[in-house]
Amino acid sequence: MAENGAAEGTAQQPQVQMNILGQFIRDLSFENVMAQKGVGGEVQPDVNVQVALDAKKRSTENQYEVITKLNIESKNKAGGEVLFVLELEYVGIFNIAGVPEDQLHPFLLIECPRMLFPFLRRIVSDISRDGGFPPLNLDNIDFVAIYRNELARRQAEAPAEVTN
């Protein structure tokens, strides 16, 4: 009898469905600063990767646009000269159903970028290689930490906005 109750409880929860309907590069910029300035010799790159996330509801029911923005700057460790700058805005169009409303925001900004990440990694690797550098293979990005940091930042700003 306990098994029937457990089966009934799980049957009532909606099944989460997520489909990637499309994905594309919205904006891409690569500047080989090293070649433009004529920097030569041995360089030891120091790479800084900044990630920004955004999600928007589309006009079609259950469709969302998830945007991952990467800003990558590589500098020479020795002199601090900029070697290259890569800016990428990558978009995924998702059809999502069965996610409770209170869990939708983290789902969009954690799970969706996680699904897109292998494609982002390949693009960054190809662009850096095609730009005259060794392929830059990004480490895994902790989208949960990025989400939590953004929530903490917004909560810290909220009292300041109320008092102003």
Curated annotation (Swiss-Prot):
Keyword Glycosyltransferase: no
Alphabetical list of Pfam families matching this protein: SecB (PF02556)
Taxonomy, superkingdom: Bacteria
Single Gene Ontology MF annotation: unfolded protein binding
Subcellular location: Cytoplasm
Gene3D superfamilies linked: SecB-like
Keyword terms: Chaperone, Cytoplasm, Protein transport, Translocation, Transport
InterPro entries named in the record: SecB, SecB-like_sf
Similarity section: Belongs to the SecB family.
Subunit structure comment from the entry: Homotetramer, a dimer of dimers. One homotetramer interacts with 1 SecA dimer.
NCBIfam families with a match to the protein in the record: PRK05751.1-3, secB
This protein's name: Protein-export protein SecB
Organism: Ruegeria sp. (strain TM1040)
